[in-house]
Design a protein with these regions (language model features):
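Extracytoplasmic
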Residues: 1-74
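Beta-strand acidic-aromatic groove motif in beta-rich domains, primarily in extracellular
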Residues: 246-258, 298
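Aromatic/acidic, Gly/Pro-rich catalytic loop(s) in extracytoplasmic/lumenal soluble domains
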Residues: 109-204
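Luminal/periplasmic acceptor-recognition loop/helix of membrane-associated glycosyltransferases
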Residues: 19-22, 57-120
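Short carbohydrate-recognition loop motifs
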Residues: 193-221
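Short beta-strand-plus-loop segments that form exposed binding edges in beta-rich domains
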Residues: 300-308
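Extra-cytoplasmic beta-strand recognition segments
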Residues: 75, 168, 173-176, 181-183, ...
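Extracellular carbohydrate recognition and processing domains
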Residues: 262-295, 307
Length: 343
């Protein structure tokens, strides 16, 4: 069974997780710390401060990588009960959740170095299995296996948009893609091959996602997100925005939560802090929304303090379970999430 409390049973999760170093002497003698950028534990674990938690963990999947990291000094990508950046969390989870998706932080790694993968004897996700198939086996023990994958090979693995599209089409009935300001549903990989994914601001991320093109969004955008028995404690709303950096800096997001008992929270303002550039004048704005189990609906809108209109090309709402898109009254529904542009 899944041990959800494996970390919470220790007074100090790190030091009490470090096991007998001597049992790893043979393996440690084969590991040159200078060759490795990081350790990636599989199954991947993440228990951070933003509630985007994974719990498919057994004790060995934490204690073995922690022990080897402690002895070698190689940093570990997994997160256990620490303050975490939401953007970094998205990147980390993307590495193991969706095969062939672009992971920004890996681009800073040296092509000549390697990632040390430590696999415990526990079931892996499809994304983890796909990643592992590109790695080389170093050592196989009773409780764990060591693999290595060169950063150059990892970058090539991440830069295969056609394979990413194929994977997404295998898990969805259709894929909604955006190019040159127009969106279309596709259901055949041959149609995907004709599209230039490198020029598309709408990249599929770690979640099962969709995108909406707003034909005439106007100066401001308002969304109303109703919920019905949500499966997750966190969702992510993303805005792909085309704007000059000055106009973007003067724009704020305002959101208001309404709970199932009809309690209406005061609106909250937020400067667009979670922003990254994706192309010339294209920006990705992320708004994480936590504790959605309590929500009946969520309203989000932009407020500008400049006269220049902010062109919002499309909007994504992501969750780790489902996404539903509404475009001009046409509803594509998966599970219990959906969203609509409110008048």
């Amino acid at each position: 069974s899944v041990k959800k409390d494996v970390f919470h049973n220790w007074e100090n999760p790190f030091y009490t997780a470090v096991g007998d170093i001597e049992q790893f002497n043979d393996e440690l003698s084969k590991i040159d710390s200078d060759l490795f950028e990081a350790i990636l534990p599989l199954p991947y674990f993440h228990i951070g401060s933003e509630i985007a938690n994974t719990y498919n963990i057994v004790e060995s999947s934490f204690s073995i990588p922690t022990t080897i990291s402690y002895k070698t000094g190689i940093p570990m990508i997994g997160v256990c009960m620490s303050r975490t950046s939401f953007n970094q969390t998205i990147s980390n989870l993307s590495l193991v959740k969706v095969p062939h998706s672009a992971i920004p932080f890996v681009n800073s790694f040296s092509n000549d170095k390697f990632i040390l993968i430590i696999k415990s004897n526990y079931s892996l996700s499809e994304g983890e299995l796909e990643l592992l198939s590109h790695a080389n086996l170093m050592t196989k023990k009773e409780d764990y296996e060591l693999y290595s994958i060169q950063i150059k090979a990892l970058k090539e693995y991440m830069n295969e948009p056609k394979k990413l599209a194929q994977y997404l089409l295998e898990t969805q009935d259709s894929l909604y893609v955006v190019q040159d300001g127009r969106g279309q549903y596709i259901s055949d990989i041959d149609d995907v091959i004709e599209l230039n994914f490198d020029e598309m601001p709408n990249r599929k991320g770690m979640f099962d996602t969709g995108a909406l093109i707003l034909d005439k969004p106007g100066d401001n955008l308002i969304l109303e997100v109703p919920f019905s028995s949500p499966q997750d404690s966190l969702i992510l709303i993303e805005f792909w925005v085309k704007a000059k950096s000055y106009d973007l800096a003067k724009t704020r997001l305002l959101w208001q939560r309404i709970t199932k008992d009809k309690k209406m929270y005061p609106p909250n303002f937020s400067l667009l802090e979670m922003v990254k550039s994706v192309a010339d004048d294209w920006w990705l704005i992320s708004l994480p929304v936590e504790n959605v189990e309590e929500l009946k609906s969520l309203k989000v809108w932009t407020v500008q303090s400049t006269n220049a209109p902010l062109h919002i090309d499309n909007v994504l709402i992501r969750s780790s379970k489902s996404t539903v898109i509404r475009k001009k009254g046409n509803i594509l529904q998966k599970d219990n999430y959906f969203w609509s542009d409110s008048k």
